[in-house]
Amino acid sequence: MTQAVRDGMGSSSDAQRRIRRSPLLFTAPLIFLVLLSAVLIWEMTRANVSAEARTEWPWRLQLIAPEALGSLLAVAAGAVLARAQYARTVSPYLGWRGAWVKGQLAENASAWRVGILNGGQHLAVVESWDCRVVMTGARDLAGAPWGSVRSTAAELTDAGLVDGEDFRLIAFGAGFPLVGAGAGYETVLMGAFSENFVARVQSLYVRVRITDVVGDTHERIMDCMKGIGATGDRTAG
């Protein structure tokens, strides 16, 4: 069989996205900056009223000295910008690769092997790992429910496919570390699938959610069956 290789780095249809930011490390500093900005607006408005008016309520209310307010604003703005830059630096980059290889299921039979890697420089931790199957000829409904690797394997078995012979699915539990690959491209096995499986399954989606070192949560949905018909090497932009 002609070898087909498919890289899933940055494909537009299954692009990685940030779905949640850390409340402590992102939301709290941002709220503090907004509050200080509101205080600044109040003090600027108060400074433009007459001295006589400032002797009456509410204009006589001084929340904070201008010098201290300026320093706090500079610190808060710097913290928000530094956090944003650091989050970009340590952001994980999930990628996947599929290739026809031998020895994954039966010794001499070709199987479609799919692996995942973290192309970033820093560690990320698995938060959740879910799957969804679309059999050949079935409708691919975007709102279909997700299930665990175990329930997905049971669904495939009920469809007549044999675990260990037609497919092999790897479960990644919450807390599993995905080490940054650096300059390498070695992948961690997600699953292997026989030619019979490929003929009977239209799509096998894997939804991966990971948490980076600053507490942000990222998600990527990968179709393990994508690119099987390609020949030669192909890389998504």
PLM feature spans:
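Serine/threonine-enriched low-complexity regions used as flexible
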Residues: 193-215
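Short, surface-exposed linear segments at secondary-structure transitions and domain or protein termini
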Residues: 135-138, 155-166, 226-237
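Acidic, serine/threonine- and proline-rich intrinsically disordered appendage/tail regions
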Residues: 2-14, 207-237
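Short, solvent-exposed loop/turn segments enriched in Ser/Thr/Gly
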Residues: 107-113, 185-188, 203-205
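Short aromatic-acidic-glycine turn motif
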Residues: 133-151
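Membrane-proximal alpha-helical anchors
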Residues: 2-127, 131-134, 237
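Intrinsically disordered, low-complexity Pro/Gly/Ser/Thr-rich segments with frequent PxxP/GP/PP motifs
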Residues: 146-194
